[in-house]
């Protein structure tokens, strides 16, 4: 797979408890087929962070790569901005 054809995403870090792995949540907006309203869906990805630079609340850019483990198929490109940890703790938690 060519490097330029790989998918890239922007998301917010919700967990950095694993070694060299972060959990990033990405919000995706889809249009409801019947009513036409935009509905927000979120999806979590496990992302490889070799230098362990990303912290909870950071906005990060990551890309698709070869499978690194059973659940990890993305790697961190760069940290776009630093956010507050308390914001993510409350808004990023799902049941």
UniProtKB/Swiss-Prot annotation:
An annotated Gene Ontology molecular function? structural constituent of ribosome
The protein's UniProt keywords, in alphabetical order, are: Ribonucleoprotein, Ribosomal protein, RNA-binding, rRNA-binding
- A UniProt-annotated Pfam family: Ribosomal_S17
KW S-adenosyl-L-methionine (keyword) present:
no
- What SUPFAM superfamilies does the record point to? Nucleic acid-binding proteins
Asked if the keyword Metal-binding belongs to this entry, the reply reads: no
Q: InterPro entries, from UniProt?
A: NA-bd_OB-fold, Ribosomal_uS17, Ribosomal_uS17_bact/chlr
Supply one GO BP term: translation
The residue ranges crossing the membrane are none
Gene3D superfamilies recorded = Nucleic acid-binding proteins (2.40.50.140)
A cellular component term from Gene Ontology for this protein is: cytosolic small ribosomal subunit
Family (UniProt): Belongs to the universal ribosomal protein uS17 family.
Subunit composition and interactions: Part of the 30S ribosomal subunit.
Task: Give a short account of what the protein does.
Answer: One of the primary rRNA binding proteins, it binds specifically to the 5'-end of 16S ribosomal RNA.
Instruction: Give the protein name, as stated in the record.
Output: Small ribosomal subunit protein uS17
Q: Which gene encodes it?
A: rpsQ
């Amino acid at each position: 797979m060519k490097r330029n054809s790989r998918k890239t995403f922007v998301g917010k870090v919700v967990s950095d408890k694993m070694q060299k792995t972060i959990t990033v949540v990405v919000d995706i907006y889809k249009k409801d087929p019947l009513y036409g309203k935009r509905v927000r869906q979120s999806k979590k990805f496990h992302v490889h962070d070799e230098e362990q630079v990303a912290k909870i609340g950071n906005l990060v850019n990551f890309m698709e790569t070869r499978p690194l483990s059973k659940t990890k198929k993305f790697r961190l490109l760069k940290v776009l901005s630093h956010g507050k940890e308390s914001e993510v703790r409350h808004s990023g938690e799902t049941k």
